[in-house]
Amino acid sequence: MCGIAGLIHRGKSSNVGSELQGMLQALKHRGEDSTGYALYGDTDGKNFIMRFKVGENVGEGSSSIMEDVSVYDERKKIVDQYLLELGVKIVKEERVLPYSLRYEISYDAKDLLEFSQKIESIPGVEILSMGKSLEVIKIGRAHV
């Protein structure tokens, strides 16, 4: 079960990151999937940002099974092959953690449902977010 918390600061500066971490730390007891951020970014609106994972965070008492990093690499190769088959161009690629990736992609969004279903048909792969301005970032515990 997840929980939702938010911040709005109007006309003043604040240490938003620290405040968000405090709220997320308070939600951490709800389980390994409870901790994340949703951020709006300033983009040109042309490309999609896809955040996805090819494995699980096995820390923090997770029930997930520890996998060798090579398993993540194999799943990533399959994702890349599927993207190629769908006519997607990877503009930028970041590996945030061994199991967590962020792609900026160029894609003529014919059918995002079909796109998502194809990518998530790969065992162990889950799209966390896909959009042109909002990113959902879920990479583990709230405490840094």
What is each of the regions a protein language model found here?
Residues 1-141:
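N-terminal segments that mediate ammonia production and transfer
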